[in-house]
Every structure is written in C-alpha cells, then in structure tokens.
C-alpha cells in the first residue's frame, strides 16, 4: 500500500504520513471466523500484578482466527477479500476453498483478489502457496514458517517480513530470518512462499498521543523522574543524575548491551548465528 499525508488541519495531522487503505481493503470480518477477547487488566497476571508495563486501555477488538497451519492440502482456494486486522500489522485474506471451507490467512505481498492458492507437498512454487521446506528451492523468499511440525507458522509473520532459505543439509534446512539470525529448521516444517504484505506499515507516524492509547499503549515514564522506591535512577532534588556509572533497568540489570536471552535454552543448538 502507498503512503499518503494528511492535510494540516490540526497539529496532530501536520506532515503525518500513514498507509493508504484503497478500496480493496475491508474492515468488516466474517462473523464465524471471529471471537471476543478478554481485555480486563491489560498487562496484569492472574493476581493483578503488572507483568508487562505500559499496557492498558485501547479500542475493543474482535480476534480474527488465522489459519497458520494451512491444513487444506491439495485443495485450491480463491482470495475473496483483503481485510484490515487490528491485532497485527499485516493485512489478512479471506480464502474460499473448493470444499466449502472459509479461512483467513496472512496477506502475501502481490496477491490480489481472485488469485488462487493451495498447500501441500509438491505444490507449485508461487506466491501464497504453502509447502514443506524440503520442496522449496534455495534462495526462495518465504514467511509464516513452522518451528515445530504441525504447530503452524510462527516465524516471519509481521508486515513486510521475509526469510530466505539458504541451505539444505540432511534433515535440516538453514534459514536467514528477518532479524539476521541464521537457524536450523526441520525440512518437514512448512512455510508460505513470498513476503508478507503491507510493507509500508512502519513508515507511518501516529501523530499524537491519543493514537497510541487507541493501540493499548500507555505512557513510558523515565526512571530519573521517579521516586527511589520505583526505580534505581529515582530520587534527588531537582534535575539530578542517575548516580551510577551506567543506566540500569527498574530491576537493577544493566540497561545497555546486556543480553536478555536466557542461557542453555533448548533452541540454542538450532541457532547458528544470533540476531543482530
């Protein structure tokens, strides 16, 4: 989708670029493919304690049930609509399959209404088709990649995301992920050909604080203006420094350059090169 700018009629619209929604993108989903979401206590756990900071509020949403597993093997489906999904940055497509099933999938870049897609081993190498990695040629752009066989696509699902198949050896394939990480995936895991659509999703600007509140994101307060009980940087009279050699997190860990990934994770053996 293209980027357009608002005319300046309020301060929040001055020079504000956003993704333009053309007439093909709809916002009224299929009722049978949606479900409600329990949004009480956003960012809290079952005891009401904040586990994810700066979350809360936001507009009500219906969850669109996305088919990440692509179980309709060897059945052709037609792209009927391209729709907006408030729960993700990418657009979604409504697919009508030949057996009468209707399912949502992520919108691959370049797929238009009326196109036909399919899935399964030895499916054609065309955009939108899903097939095992063992049948994908080297150098192919893919997205919605399985990590565990049968669990459905988990990698490269955001708007504009694309991974590359760079090697095959034994029962494993080597992928270069959007983060720059290079990791091994079983050759039996499936992936979808092409790149996720809405590549300009990150080129827009929110323009005002209220737009961020609509997304369920609350303000981020600097630690230096808090009290000592709330943050290690807090306290002091007026504009005082943090009182430490290096910045730290609210829990006292180094804030700059410290690796947050846990040691000895089960997936360490599959990662050949860490992300950038």
UniProtKB/Swiss-Prot annotation:
Family the UniProt entry places it in: Belongs to the universal ribosomal protein uL2 family.
Disulfide bridges in this chain: none
Entry's Gene Ontology molecular function annotations: rRNA binding; structural constituent of ribosome; transferase activity
Record note on quaternary structure: Part of the 50S ribosomal subunit.
Localisation per UniProt entry: Plastid, Chloroplast
HAMAP family the UniProt entry points to: Ribosomal_uL2_B
Highest taxon, organism lineage: Eukaryota
Region Disordered, annotated ranges: 1-51, 224-276
Stretches with biased composition (Polar residues): 7-18, 27-37
Cellular component, GO annotation: chloroplast; mitochondrial large ribosomal subunit
This protein's name: Large ribosomal subunit protein uL2c
Predominant location category: plastid
SMART domains: Ribosomal_L2 (SM01383), Ribosomal_L2_C (SM01382)
Claim: Zinc-finger is one of the keywords in the record: no
Organism: Cycas taitungensis
Gene Ontology BP terms: mitochondrial translation
């Amino acid at each position: 989708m293209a980027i357009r700018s608002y005319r300046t009629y309020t301060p929040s619209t001055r020079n504000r670029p956003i993704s333009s929604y053309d007439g093909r993108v709809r916002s009224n989903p299929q009722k049978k493919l949606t479900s409600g979401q329990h949004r009480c206590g956003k960012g809290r756990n079952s005891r009401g304690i904040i586990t994810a900071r700066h979350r809360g509020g936001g507009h009500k949403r219906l969850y669109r049930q996305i088919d990440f597993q692509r179980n309709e093997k060897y059945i052709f489906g037609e792209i009927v609509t391209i729709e907006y999904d408030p729960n993700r940055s990418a657009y979604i497509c409504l697919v009508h399959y030949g057996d009468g099933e209707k399912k949502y999938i992520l919108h691959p870049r370049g797929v238009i209404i009326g196109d036909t897609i399919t899935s399964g081993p030895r499916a054609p190498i065309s955009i939108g088709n899903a097939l095992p990695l063992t049948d994908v040629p080297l150098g192919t752009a893919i997205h919605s990649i399985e990590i565990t066989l049968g669990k459905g696509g988990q990698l490269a699902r955001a708007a504009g995301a694309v991974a590359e198949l760079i090697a095959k050896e034994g029962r494993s394939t080597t992928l270069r992920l959007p983060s720059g990480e290079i990791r091994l995936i079983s050759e039996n895991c499936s992936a979808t050909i092409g790149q996720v659509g809405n590549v300009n999703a990150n080129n827009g600007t929110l323009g005002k604080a209220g737009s961020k509140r609509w997304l369920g994101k609350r303000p981020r307060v600097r630690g230096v203006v808090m009290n000592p009980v709330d943050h290690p940087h807090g306290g002091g009279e007026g504009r005082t420094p943090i009182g430490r050699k290096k910045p730290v997190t609210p829990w006292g860990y180094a804030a700059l350059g410290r690796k947050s990934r846990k040691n000895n994770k089960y997936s360490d053996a599959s990662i050949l090169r860490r992300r950038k």
